[in-house]
C-alpha cells in the first residue's frame, strides 16, 4: 500500500533542465551519463535511448573537443531526453553546444580562464535559458586548495564550490545547481551537509567513481541514502563502472526504498529458508525479469511461508504467502485465491499485469476527466 515519505526535503530554488524541473517541490530527478565515444553518434544515441527507456530524466554527455561538440549537435537532434554537456577548460566548446541546443552546461566557471570568457559562457546560458551545473570533484581540486588543506576534505570541496558560485553571483546568474563529489562516502556526505545550509540552489547528489556494480551500488546507496534521509538532494546519479542503464535502476530503487519516488514494482521478498513452500529465489528472479517493463508503482510481497507472509501481504498491493497444499494470493490486503506451485510464476505475472492494466485505465480516466 502506498505510504507518504516522512522525509522533509530541503527547500531549494527550482531550475529547468530542458522540460524537467529540478529543485523546489519537483520530484527528485534520476540521471546517468553516457560512456560511449561522443563522436560515435549512432552508439551514443542508442545508449541514450536505452537510458531513457530505463526511466532516466536527464543524461549527461562528455564533450571534450570541438569535434565532439559537432557530434553532440547531431545527437541532440535524435533524442528527446534533456542533455547536459560535460565540459572542462575550453569555453568555446560551451558556446558551441549552447548554439546546438544543450539543456544544461556542466562547467566550472573558475576553470575556463579570463573573465571575458566566463562572461561569454554565462551570457550564452542566460540568453538561451540554459542552467549551469557546478561540479566539484575531490580528484580535481584546485592546486591552491590542495596546498591549503593538504588533502581533499569536505571544507575544501565546499570552498571550491563557493569560489565558482561567487563568479556566477558577480554576473547575477542564479540558474545553477551544484554537486560536491568524492569517492569516499563520509567526505561526500559531510560536504553536502555543509553547503546545503549556505546556498538555495538545487543539489545534484553522487558518490563519484564509486566502483563496479556491487561495490558502487553499496557506496551510493549508503551515501545518497544518508543525504536523502536528511532531505538533501534534488537530482541523483549512481556512478557505476557498469552499464548506465543499471545506474537508473539502482537510482530508482534508492528513491523507492525511501518512498521519495516510485517507478515500477517494489518487491518485498523473504530470503527463504527451509519453511518455504515454493522456491522464493527462483520465483523472484523470474518475476523481476518478466515484469521489468512495468512502470506503474506497486508493492508486491513474495513470502515463502505463513510466519511473516500474511502480515506482509496485508500491507502490500499484491501478496503471496507460501502454504500447503497451495499458496495464498492476496489482493489489496485480503485473501483472493489459491495458487498452485506448478503454474505459480505464470499465474502471478498474469494477476499482476491485470492489476497494472486496471490502474493504468483508472489513471487514464482521471486524466481524461480533468481535461474535460
Swiss-Prot record:
InterPro entries: Dihydropteroate_synth-like_sf, IspG_bac, IspG_bac-typ, NO2/SO3_Rdtase_4Fe4S_sf. Transmembrane segments: none annotated. GO terms for molecular function: 4 iron, 4 sulfur cluster binding; 4-hydroxy-3-methylbut-2-en-1-yl diphosphate synthase activity (ferredoxin); 4-hydroxy-3-methylbut-2-enyl-diphosphate synthase activity (flavodoxin); iron ion binding. It catalyses: (2E)-4-hydroxy-3-methylbut-2-enyl diphosphate + oxidized [flavodoxin] + H2O + 2 H(+) = 2-C-methyl-D-erythritol 2,4-cyclic diphosphate + reduced [flavodoxin]. Pfam families: GcpE. GO terms for biological process: isopentenyl diphosphate biosynthetic process, methylerythritol 4-phosphate pathway; terpenoid biosynthetic process. Binds 1 [4Fe-4S] cluster. Its cofactor is [4Fe-4S] cluster. Keywords: 4Fe-4S, Iron, Iron-sulfur, Isoprene biosynthesis, Metal-binding, Oxidoreductase. Pathway: Isoprenoid biosynthesis; isopentenyl diphosphate biosynthesis via DXP pathway; isopentenyl diphosphate from 1-deoxy-D-xylulose 5-phosphate: step 5/6. The keyword Oxidoreductase applies. Its EC number is 1.17.7.3. [4Fe-4S] cluster binds at residues 270, 273, 305, 312. Converts 2C-methyl-D-erythritol 2,4-cyclodiphosphate (ME-2,4cPP) into 1-hydroxy-2-methyl-2-(E)-butenyl 4-diphosphate. NCBIfam families: ispG_gcpE, PRK00366.1. Belongs to the IspG family. This is 4-hydroxy-3-methylbut-2-en-1-yl diphosphate synthase (flavodoxin). The lineage of its organism: Bacteria, Pseudomonadati, Pseudomonadota, Gammaproteobacteria, Pseudomonadales. The gene is ispG.
Amino acid at each position: 500500500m502506498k505510504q507518504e515519505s516522512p522525509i522533509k526535503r530541503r527547500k531549494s530554488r527550482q531550475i529547468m533542465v530542458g522540460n524537467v524541473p529540478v529543485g523546489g517541490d519537483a520530484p527528485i530527478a534520476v540521471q546517468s551519463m553516457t560512456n560511449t565515444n561522443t563522436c560515435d553518434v549512432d552508439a551514443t544515441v542508442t545508449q541514450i535511448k536505452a537510458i531513457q527507456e530505463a526511466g532516466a530524466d536527464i543524461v549527461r554527455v562528455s564533450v571534450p573537443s570541438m569535434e565532439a561538440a559537432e557530434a553532440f549537435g547531431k545527437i541532440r537532434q535524435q533524442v528527446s531526453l534533456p542533455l547536459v554537456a560535460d565540459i572542462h577548460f575550453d569555453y568555446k566548446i560551451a558556446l558551441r553546444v549552447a548554439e546546438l541546443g544543450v539543456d544544461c552546461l556542466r562547467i566550472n566557471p573558475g576553470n575556463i580562464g579570463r573573465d571575458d570568457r566566463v562572461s561569454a559562457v554565462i551570457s550564452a546560458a542566460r540568453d538561451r535559458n540554459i542552467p549551469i551545473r557546478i561540479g566539484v570533484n575531490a580528484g580535481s581540486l584546485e592546486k591552491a586548495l590542495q596546498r591549503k588543506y593538504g588533502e581533499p576534505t569536505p571544507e575544501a570541496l565546499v570552498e571550491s564550490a563557493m569560489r565558482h558560485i561567487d563568479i556566477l553571483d558577480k554576473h547575477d546568474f542564479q540558474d545553477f545547481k551544484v554537486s560536491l563529489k568524492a569517492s569516499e562516502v563520509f567526505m561526500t556526505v559531510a560536504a553536502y551537509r555543509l553547503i546545503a545550509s549556505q546556498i538555495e540552489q538545487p543539489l545534484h547528489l553522487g558518490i563519484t567513481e564509486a566502483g563496479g556494480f556491487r561495490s558502487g551500488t553499496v557506496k551510493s546507496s549508503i551515501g545518497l541514502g544518508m543525504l536523502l534521509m536528511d532531505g538533501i538532494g534534488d537530482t541523483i546519479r549512481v556512478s557505476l563502472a557498469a552499464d548506465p542503464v543499471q545506474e537508473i535502476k539502482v537510482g530508482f530503487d534508492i528513491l523507492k526504498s525511501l518512498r521519495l519516488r516510485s517507478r515500477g514494482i517494489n518487491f518485498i521478498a523473504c530470503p527463504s529458508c527451509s519453511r518455504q513452500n515454493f522456491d522464493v529465489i527462483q520465483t523472484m528472479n523470474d518475476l523481476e525479469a518478466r515484469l521489468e517493463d512495468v512502470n506503474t508503482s506497486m508493492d508486491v510481497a513474495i513470502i515463502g511461508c505463513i510466519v511473516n507472509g500474511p502480515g506482509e501481504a496485508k500491507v502490500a498491493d499484491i501478496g503471496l504467502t507460501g502454504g500447503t497444499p497451495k499458496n495464498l494470493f492476496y489482493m489489496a490486503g485480503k485473501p483472493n485465491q489459491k495458487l498452485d506451485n506448478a503454474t505459480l510464476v505464470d499465474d502471478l505475472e498474469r494477476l499482476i499485469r491485470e492489476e497494472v492494466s486496471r490502474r493504468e485505465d483508472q489513471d487514464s480516466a482521471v486524466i481524461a476527466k480533468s481535461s474535460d
